[in-house]
Amino acid sequence: MELTNLIEKCTKLSKDFATEVEKLWNDELSSESGLSRKTRNVIRNILRDITKSLTTDKKSKCFCILERSTINGEQIKDVYKTIFNNGVDVESRINTTGKYVLFTVMTYAAAELRLIKSDEIFALLSRFFNMICDIHRKYGCGNMFVGIPAALIVLLEIDHINKLFSVFSTRYDAKAYLYTEYFLFLNINHYLLSGSDLFINVAYCAVSFSSPIRVPDYIMEALTFKACDHIMKSGDLKYTYAFTKKVKDLFNTKSDSIYQYVRLHEMSYDGVSEDTDDDDEVFAILNLSIDSSVDRYRNRVLLLTPEVASLRKEYSEAEPDYKYLMDEEVSAYDKHLPKPITNTGIEEPHATGGDKEDQPIKVVYPPNNDKDDAIKPHNPLEDPNYVPTITRTDIGIADYQLVINKLIEWLDKCEEECGNGGEFKTELEEAKRKLTELNAELSDKLSKIMSLERDSVHKTERIDRLTKEIKELRDIQNGTDDGSDSSEIDKKIIRELRESLDREREMRSKLEKELDTIRDGKVEGSCQRELELRRMWLKQRDDDLRAEIDKRRNVEWELSRLRRDIKECDKYKEDLDKAKATISNYVSRISTLESEIAKYQQDRDTLSVVRRELEEERRRVKDLESRLDECTRNQEDTQEVDALRSRIRELENKLTDCIESGGGNLTEISRLQSRISDLERQLNECRGNVTEISRLESRISDLERQLNDCRRNNETNAETERDATS
């Protein structure tokens, strides 16, 4: 169904989105959770519609329509506020697929509408993706993925993209595989695009995206691009294809499907498919012109996501799968051409009992102004400019080589059961001979087809070149004088070219007849050729994939080694920080001890002064003794003399004790100073060796104890000195 009006389209898509979320509302998140193609298309359609509304005067109306849509009777705006809860305990609230889809889509839509600065978008997405990692870590839902729309991606710098990539690459327990692949693709694409002239550009409205490599469908879905968007490619890309639609499931299973694709011959397309909201829409770019060594998505199983998302393979575990030959090639959709009328009352050939596959297909065009030609089937043979297009179908439908091999196997089995002398021996030998001849004929036809196709391509290119030259010569002829010599020469050249063109057309007609005879009449040659091409292609892709696997294995081994080295470095750094802290503590303690030693040196100086005073007191005592002797000789009263003598003896004893005590303290201080100097020297040596710290600690403790003893002795000496002076 084609949609045109923006508001009507937004209303319908918002309703579809709400309905899809309701269906998934109670599906609990788990390792098997994933979004179907229908759900992914619904998400892409609503985000595209909001992006388109940003360039109109209805900038916020589409978003308001989405907010007012109801889920289980409640508006989406209120439901979103409830499950978000200001970012508190989000991983516990978002526990189902429906809540996950609503949370991601509403966050992206609000960001598109309200944010325009790259830093603001980056800040929002950083917080948002950390919440996503918490959800994936809690429920292990590695296949859940709703990527950033292109409307936000184009506003981010490559540094922002790399930082967002690191959010997922560093959260090893998050199991957000598709998000990691998404940002890895954006990173690879940026650096390859900056150094390459080859590119494919997809754009709609004001949003565009360019890539020199293949773009998987889930990347296109995340960026919100569709096959109906404007596509432009550089002229050097010759083998480029756009997948547009899923046709059917392969082998009636959901593990793989057959898709339609369009080969991009022109440099620009205004869309290659119709703009619809169908559930089976697909959009992926296959670029076979790029070197496979720089492209992770050459493998078909990585380019096209299966219907069941949990069956998707990772890059490291994907087996070679190149079923591109099984997909159906279709022509590009042109919205300027009228649609074929299928209900015209003309009897179809197969309706009369004929074989449907053997009947020619008649394309009926709309009636024009001529009443006689109101309904006229188109006959390609009457069109001189008609070039037949040979399309491929499923290889398994008419692989006659496999049929021949099966028949030979069956005949061998019959011969064993019937015996060598059976009545059917002659018939069996004749059948084997015919099959052998048929096999040889198939090989001959195969080589002939390859030769004819090469000649056909060469002749077609030559015809196009000659046609272009004839057109140029006709333009020259129309602009010259008929009586001039150059005009005669031009006419002669034109006649020769026309004759050559007639010969080429005749040769081309023969080649087409031969191709029609072999490929349409005897399909086995075409199928055999396609089978061989597929085998060759598979072998080449298998070799490429094995080389990529080896490279990845080497890179992973190197990454593992680097991680181990980083862990060891972190451990050494932690030990070094601890050692530095310990050394800093000991340095501070040593500084304290040095200050105390300086204080005790001052006390030693004071003690020297005391010693000098004691010596002076000794001299005074001697002087007193001499005076006492003189007094004794001069006085007869001895009682006072005895008292003075006892006082002198007492003072002498105290003086002797003080001198002895002072000398001991000086000796102890000198010894401690020498030990402290030796300790300082050893400490300087120990600063380069962390193992000496413990020994220094014990020695410093002993030194502190001795200093405390010395302090007590000095206090005792001070008391003695006070007693002596008194």
UniProtKB/Swiss-Prot annotation:
GO terms for biological process: viral process. It is found in: Virion. Sequence repeats lie at residues 612-634, 639-661, 667-689, 691-713. Belongs to the poxviridae A25 protein family. One of its GO terms (molecular function) is chromatin binding. Residues 347-360 have a biased composition (Basic and acidic residues). Keywords: Late protein, Repeat, Virion. Some orthopoxviruses such as cowpox, ectromelia, and raccoonpox viruses, form large cytoplasmic inclusions within which mature virions are embedded by a process called occlusion. In those viruses, A26 bridges mature virion with inclusion bodies through interactions with proteins A25 and A27 on the mature virion membrane. In camelpox virus, the protein A25 is deleted in its C-terminal region and no inclusion body is observed. Its main location: virion. PANTHER family: STRUCTURAL MAINTENANCE OF CHROMOSOMES PROTEIN 2. Residues 342-361 are annotated as: Disordered. Structural protein that forms a matrix surrounding the mature virion (MV) through interaction with protein A26. Presence of protein A25 in the virion structurally prevents direct virus-cell fusion mechanism. The keyword Repeat applies. GO terms for cellular component: virion component. It comes from Camelpox virus (strain CP-1). This is A-type inclusion protein A25 homolog. The keyword Repeat applies. Pfam families: Pox_A_type_inc (PF04508). Residues 612-713 are annotated as: 4 X approximate tandem repeats. Interacts (via N-terminus) with protein A26.
